[in-house]
Amino acid sequence: GWFVFQLGRRITSSDGGVIALAYYLFVPLGVLVSRSIQPDALMVMLLVIAAYGLVKWSDERTWTWAVVAGLTAGLTVLVKGRPLPIVVAMLIGILVSSRKLRDTVRDPKVWLILGLTALLPAIYYVVVIGGGTAGYVRAYSTGLAALLLEPSFYVRWLNFFDNLLFLNLAFIGVAGIVLLRARARGLMLGLWIGYVLYGLALPYTIYTHDYYNLPAVPIVGLSLAPAAALLLAKVVRLNLPWQVFLVAVGISLIAYRSWLVRSGILGTDYYAEPAGWVNMGEDLPEQGTIIGLTHDYGARIAYYGWRNVAVWPTGQDYAFYELQGRTQGKFEEEFDARAAGYDYFLVTLFGELDNQPLLKQRLFDQYPIAAEGEGYLLFDLRQGSDT
């Protein structure tokens, strides 16, 4: 948060920095993800520090800030490879708007920034897990490029964005970029162009997974800074009663949004979750392999119960396969192929099981229940009536 305020203050004023920080701290998506064990919050923090480092380097042209900007930009992509378009566009925006192109190309500090940005991500994503990187790009990006030709994709994206981050504020922020100085304008245009390219590169998850939009939180917040600074400059010239009134309105808005987020967090009680998964892990057979229709692609039982469960696709997964153009064969053939080599079938998602009637019928008709407990059923695939 400190870097958001400092960056907002640096590109506008302290008033703009306060508004950018308020949005960053209180927008519901940011609050919810900050309480998650996912690395996305760290990725966003590094992105903000990288942007701040670039602005400081652009102003001071020191080797220290070149190293800070390059390292944090590289670490942003290392933590999560997805925001690569945002980082690249941000770099281009600030570099192009800072000096003449010829001077920029001849500056060794520029090449240091670019080298540090590329080094660690290239080692990890190309050398260490190159095959996995290529598979991810095929599955979630190039394999879904046809979605970009459908108008419904853009409608879904904008609607999803609006529900998460308030589209009207984003439009105000984009319009407010024209109020910035050249270098700050280049930075913010780079961030916005990068976010758009980021969404186009991930044309399915950008409107189905809320945390994929997390990089937009600081972008929207910082974009609001110039318009907010202009507005607050007018407010300070008002009479005291009007100033008090507007401050009260702002505090009320923040309090209202904070209460909604708090209610959402407290409305779902996960207190008993860990114990349930621990008990399940203890109850499952120690010998034998397990495939299952289970929560979070097996992450909960793996984390709390220390049991690895191979994943049976959910309805959303099958819909994703259709978008990729992958045709599904006959159910019996699919079941035999997926379940081959596994000894048990675990079910914890009973709603999903009801939505897959052929799977439900196969399990209950042909396999005995090996274990049953609170929140789960375990079928013995070794003793099926067809074997």
What are the residue ranges of the model-derived segments?
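Periplasmic/luminal catalytic loop of GT-C fold multi-pass membrane glycosyltransferases
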Residues: 168-169, 319-384
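Transmembrane-helix signature of polytopic, membrane-embedded enzymes
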Residues: 4-26, 45, 63-64, 189-190, ...
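Short acidic/glycine- and proline-prone juxtamembrane loop motifs at membrane-interface regions
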Residues: 35-42
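Short helix- or helix-capping micro-motifs
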Residues: 20-25, 73, 77, 91
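Transmembrane alpha-helical segments
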Residues: 227-232, 241-270, 310-312
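Membrane-interface transmembrane helices that cradle and orient dolichyl/undecaprenyl
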Residues: 9-15, 50-66, 76, 180
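Short periplasmic/luminal acceptor-recognition loop of GT-C membrane glycosyltransferases, typified by
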Residues: 88, 282-320, 341-353
